[in-house]
Regions:
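Short beta-strand or tight-loop elements
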Residues: 47-49, 105
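Non-catalytic C-terminal interaction segments of nucleic acid-processing enzymes
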Residues: 2-32, 36-38, 101-180
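Accessory alpha/beta interaction modules
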Residues: 15-24, 61-63, 68, 76-78
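Flexible, charged surface loops at secondary-structure boundaries
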Residues: 28-30, 57-58, 83-85
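Catalytic cores of nucleic-acid endonucleases
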Residues: 68-113
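Active-site beta-strand-loop-beta-strand hairpin of nuclease catalytic cores
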Residues: 49-63
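A short beta-turn/loop motif at secondary-structure boundaries
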Residues: 41-45
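Short loop/edge segments at beta-strand edges and connector loops
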Residues: 37-40, 93
Length: 180
């Protein structure tokens, strides 16, 4: 099943990468993702996510890859390495930079600068257990994640996003929402 979520347009002007990143971050926060990070790189992974968010209640990890132009999209050959880390993945680009037929059905596309829709296929969710010590443990990750990412690396990713990726914030307690 696909979700169609209308976005507001910023019609008629070219958008810079920083502006696209700010729009994507704002969009993710509007969707209710409690922990949102920019330019995030999990330890020892060799990848860097433009915008990543972890939902506190639905146990979803969403990654947005920012593409400022068609050339930027065509030159990118690393985005498929991001898929094992998330339940939802989408490109964020100016309208017309990426064509829907160029993407796999499981990959979303958010276009700014024209009436646009985010198109996302629902991904299977995985279970987690949140311990009182504010430690996240993957209990039953999806097969895709289990095959591609070692458990220690997955736990470190979630800990970093949930606990250490908010500027000026100390480690929150369980009651303050450290659990996902």
């Amino acid at each position: 099943m696909l979700d169609y979520i209308p976005l507001t347009a910023t019609a008629g002007r070219r958008l810079a990468t920083a502006e696209l990143r700010a729009l994507a971050t704002s969009r993710m926060e509007d969707l209710g993702y409690a922990y949102v990070g920019n330019e995030f790189s999990p330890a020892n992974s060799g990848v860097r996510f433009d915008v990543v968010g972890v939902s506190k209640y639905t146990r979803q990890v969403r990654i947005y890859e920012i593409k400022s132009s068609r050339g930027d999209f065509l030159a990118d050959d690393k985005w498929e390495r991001y898929l094992p880390y998330c339940t939802h993945f989408a490109f964020v680009a100016p309208a017309g930079a990426i064509f829907r037929f160029e993407l796999d059905r499981a990959v979303g596309l958010i276009e700014y600068g024209a009436p646009a829709f985010e198109r996302m296929r629902r991904a299977r969710r995985f279970g987690m257990t949140v311990l009182r010590e504010d430690c996240l443990r993957a209990t039953r990750p999806s097969r895709r994640i289990r095959d591609a990412v070692p458990d220690e690396q997955w736990i470190a990713l979630l800990e970093t996003i949930a606990l250490g990726n908010r500027p000026g914030a100390s480690d929150p307690s369980y009651e303050e929402g450290a659990g996902i």
